[in-house]
């Protein structure tokens, strides 16, 4: 069986253009939601940063599945041809990416097989399975990546990386574009952006 790695979102130094980001935004359409941006109202934080500083939150917890991860999974999967999509996808995750693969596979009419470390949150594992994900639990992340490569080779599934690749960066950049668009309306100007980082996929965008 042909290995599907050529179809995956391979790491690249290419920086997504604004045109590409906007095209990705249009392509995803209503498969993801434009999450709200709201001012942070907290007296303790206001005292810490000073009264003249306004803090805004981009609330990705209101994204479908509860995290920003579907943005990347859907962008990669929408680029698959019909045969690759029919074979399904695979991935490594401790939770949010696995859930996003399940969500994406369901709405695109395919299947997902995910390898997760045994330390993954039990509730997240349950949510994955409720989405129809075939979950395999292993001892650690290194073993998970090795196992998922075996699945990719044996079944022809496309490996969707949890945070690397130009397509993933491009779709995550949509989050930043939404953020800027939201702040233009009240006439705010950004001095700094603080981004929580795990694998770095959101930060890359």
Regions picked out by a protein language model, each given a short descriptive name:
Residues 1-205:
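PLP-dependent amino-acid enzyme catalytic core
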